[in-house]
Design a protein with these regions (language model features):
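N-terminal helix-cap/turn-to-beta initiation motif at the start of protein domains
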Residues: 1-14
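Soluble ligand-binding/transfer domains with enclosed cavities or grooves
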Residues: 16-182
Length: 182
Protein backbone atom coordinates (compact mmCIF):
# COMPACT_ATOMS: atom_id res chain seq x y z
CA UNK A 1 0.00 0.00 0.00
CA UNK A 2 3.04 2.26 0.22
CA UNK A 3 3.08 2.57 -3.57
CA UNK A 4 -0.57 3.60 -3.58
CA UNK A 5 -0.03 6.27 -0.93
CA UNK A 6 3.08 7.55 -2.75
CA UNK A 7 1.22 7.76 -6.07
CA UNK A 8 -1.84 9.42 -4.53
CA UNK A 9 0.36 11.98 -2.76
CA UNK A 10 1.99 12.99 -6.03
CA UNK A 11 -1.10 13.16 -8.22
CA UNK A 12 -3.58 14.86 -5.88
CA UNK A 13 -3.74 18.60 -5.34
CA UNK A 14 -4.04 21.73 -7.48
CA UNK A 15 -1.71 22.18 -10.47
CA UNK A 16 -1.35 24.58 -13.39
CA UNK A 17 0.95 25.08 -16.37
CA UNK A 18 1.42 28.85 -15.89
CA UNK A 19 5.21 28.68 -16.43
CA UNK A 20 4.89 26.63 -19.61
CA UNK A 21 1.98 28.76 -20.86
CA UNK A 22 3.94 32.01 -20.37
CA UNK A 23 6.97 30.52 -22.17
CA UNK A 24 4.82 29.41 -25.11
CA UNK A 25 3.13 32.82 -25.28
CA UNK A 26 6.53 34.54 -25.33
CA UNK A 27 7.55 32.26 -28.23
CA UNK A 28 4.34 33.12 -30.10
CA UNK A 29 2.98 29.58 -29.89
CA UNK A 30 -0.70 28.78 -29.39
CA UNK A 31 -0.98 26.64 -26.29
CA UNK A 32 -3.63 26.31 -23.59
CA UNK A 33 -3.46 27.62 -20.07
CA UNK A 34 -4.46 24.56 -18.07
CA UNK A 35 -5.41 23.76 -14.49
CA UNK A 36 -5.68 20.30 -12.97
CA UNK A 37 -7.39 19.67 -9.62
CA UNK A 38 -7.31 16.09 -8.29
CA UNK A 39 -9.21 15.34 -5.06
CA UNK A 40 -9.77 12.03 -3.28
CA UNK A 41 -13.53 11.55 -2.90
CA UNK A 42 -13.97 8.29 -0.95
CA UNK A 43 -15.70 10.41 1.71
CA UNK A 44 -18.54 11.01 -0.78
CA UNK A 45 -19.00 7.35 -1.70
CA UNK A 46 -21.36 5.44 0.57
CA UNK A 47 -21.13 1.73 1.37
CA UNK A 48 -17.59 1.07 0.20
CA UNK A 49 -16.72 -2.59 0.84
CA UNK A 50 -15.11 -3.15 4.26
CA UNK A 51 -11.81 -4.32 2.74
CA UNK A 52 -11.77 -1.60 0.03
CA UNK A 53 -8.21 -0.35 -0.47
CA UNK A 54 -8.61 1.88 -3.54
CA UNK A 55 -8.94 5.65 -3.74
CA UNK A 56 -11.54 7.31 -5.92
CA UNK A 57 -10.42 10.67 -7.27
CA UNK A 58 -12.31 13.49 -8.97
CA UNK A 59 -10.11 14.91 -11.70
CA UNK A 60 -11.07 18.43 -12.74
CA UNK A 61 -9.22 19.66 -15.83
CA UNK A 62 -9.72 23.18 -17.13
CA UNK A 63 -8.30 24.40 -20.44
CA UNK A 64 -8.32 27.99 -21.65
CA UNK A 65 -7.33 28.95 -25.17
CA UNK A 66 -8.09 32.21 -26.95
CA UNK A 67 -10.16 33.36 -23.95
CA UNK A 68 -12.44 30.30 -24.01
CA UNK A 69 -12.46 28.03 -20.95
CA UNK A 70 -13.42 24.36 -21.19
CA UNK A 71 -13.91 21.94 -18.28
CA UNK A 72 -13.19 18.22 -18.56
CA UNK A 73 -14.10 16.35 -15.34
CA UNK A 74 -13.49 12.65 -14.71
CA UNK A 75 -13.85 10.08 -11.94
CA UNK A 76 -11.04 7.54 -11.52
CA UNK A 77 -10.22 4.75 -9.12
CA UNK A 78 -6.60 4.35 -8.05
CA UNK A 79 -5.65 0.79 -7.11
CA UNK A 80 -2.38 -0.96 -6.41
CA UNK A 81 -1.78 -4.20 -8.29
CA UNK A 82 1.29 -6.40 -8.62
CA UNK A 83 2.33 -4.69 -11.89
CA UNK A 84 2.06 -1.15 -10.47
CA UNK A 85 -0.80 1.33 -10.10
CA UNK A 86 -3.97 0.80 -12.13
CA UNK A 87 -6.30 3.69 -12.92
CA UNK A 88 -9.69 2.70 -14.39
CA UNK A 89 -12.19 5.42 -15.25
CA UNK A 90 -15.76 5.55 -13.97
CA UNK A 91 -18.78 7.28 -15.46
CA UNK A 92 -19.77 10.57 -13.83
CA UNK A 93 -22.54 9.49 -11.39
CA UNK A 94 -26.12 9.75 -12.62
CA UNK A 95 -27.76 13.02 -11.60
CA UNK A 96 -24.48 14.96 -11.83
CA UNK A 97 -23.81 17.53 -14.57
CA UNK A 98 -21.05 16.07 -16.76
CA UNK A 99 -19.95 19.58 -17.77
CA UNK A 100 -19.55 21.06 -14.29
CA UNK A 101 -18.85 17.98 -12.14
CA UNK A 102 -16.29 18.72 -9.42
CA UNK A 103 -15.39 17.50 -5.96
CA UNK A 104 -17.22 20.50 -4.46
CA UNK A 105 -20.42 19.84 -6.44
CA UNK A 106 -20.32 16.04 -6.06
CA UNK A 107 -23.26 14.60 -4.14
CA UNK A 108 -22.86 11.48 -2.04
CA UNK A 109 -23.32 8.36 -4.14
CA UNK A 110 -23.65 4.68 -3.29
CA UNK A 111 -20.71 2.52 -4.34
CA UNK A 112 -23.08 0.05 -6.04
CA UNK A 113 -24.33 2.84 -8.35
CA UNK A 114 -20.86 3.61 -9.75
CA UNK A 115 -20.28 2.36 -13.29
CA UNK A 116 -16.85 1.57 -14.71
CA UNK A 117 -16.25 3.18 -18.11
CA UNK A 118 -16.45 0.61 -20.89
CA UNK A 119 -14.59 2.89 -23.33
CA UNK A 120 -11.51 3.85 -21.30
CA UNK A 121 -8.71 1.28 -21.12
CA UNK A 122 -7.37 1.47 -17.55
CA UNK A 123 -4.03 3.28 -17.37
CA UNK A 124 -1.12 1.38 -15.83
CA UNK A 125 1.72 3.24 -14.06
CA UNK A 126 5.18 2.11 -12.95
CA UNK A 127 7.55 3.87 -10.55
CA UNK A 128 11.22 4.42 -11.38
CA UNK A 129 13.58 6.67 -9.43
CA UNK A 130 10.72 8.53 -7.71
CA UNK A 131 8.77 9.20 -10.92
CA UNK A 132 5.54 7.43 -11.83
CA UNK A 133 4.99 6.97 -15.56
CA UNK A 134 2.27 5.29 -17.57
CA UNK A 135 -0.92 5.55 -19.55
CA UNK A 136 -3.18 3.72 -21.96
CA UNK A 137 -4.65 3.69 -25.44
CA UNK A 138 -8.45 3.47 -25.65
CA UNK A 139 -10.65 2.77 -28.66
CA UNK A 140 -13.71 4.94 -28.04
CA UNK A 141 -15.20 3.69 -31.32
CA UNK A 142 -14.01 1.92 -34.46
CA UNK A 143 -12.61 5.24 -35.75
CA UNK A 144 -11.83 7.14 -32.51
CA UNK A 145 -8.69 6.51 -30.43
CA UNK A 146 -7.70 8.26 -27.19
CA UNK A 147 -4.06 8.12 -26.07
CA UNK A 148 -2.91 9.07 -22.57
CA UNK A 149 0.66 9.17 -21.24
CA UNK A 150 1.56 10.78 -17.91
CA UNK A 151 4.50 11.30 -15.58
CA UNK A 152 4.13 12.25 -11.91
CA UNK A 153 6.76 13.41 -9.44
CA UNK A 154 6.78 15.55 -6.32
CA UNK A 155 7.49 18.59 -8.52
CA UNK A 156 5.41 18.18 -11.65
CA UNK A 157 2.66 16.41 -13.56
CA UNK A 158 3.36 15.88 -17.26
CA UNK A 159 0.31 14.97 -19.34
CA UNK A 160 0.17 13.97 -23.00
CA UNK A 161 -3.26 13.19 -24.33
CA UNK A 162 -4.61 13.06 -27.84
CA UNK A 163 -7.76 12.07 -29.65
CA UNK A 164 -7.58 10.71 -33.18
CA UNK A 165 -10.43 10.13 -35.61
CA UNK A 166 -9.56 7.94 -38.59
CA UNK A 167 -5.88 8.35 -37.66
CA UNK A 168 -6.02 12.18 -37.71
CA UNK A 169 -5.45 14.06 -34.45
CA UNK A 170 -8.49 16.14 -33.47
CA UNK A 171 -7.31 17.00 -29.93
CA UNK A 172 -3.91 17.23 -28.29
CA UNK A 173 -0.63 19.07 -28.62
CA UNK A 174 2.86 18.28 -29.89
CA UNK A 175 4.31 18.87 -26.44
CA UNK A 176 2.95 17.49 -23.15
CA UNK A 177 1.27 19.88 -20.73
CA UNK A 178 3.63 20.37 -17.79
CA UNK A 179 1.76 21.19 -14.60
CA UNK A 180 3.39 22.42 -11.40
CA UNK A 181 1.81 22.28 -7.96
CA UNK A 182 0.07 25.57 -7.04
Amino acid sequence: MMKLENFVGMMTGHFDNKDQFNKMQAEGKIYPYAEHVNTICNDKINNLPEDFKGKFVVEESYYEINGKRHASPHLFLITEIEQGILLPSYEIPKGEDKNTFSYDSMKNVDYSKLEKSEKFTPALYHEKDGIWEGGSTSKFSSVMTFKLWEKFSNNFLEVSESMEVNGKRTFGYNEPIIYKRV
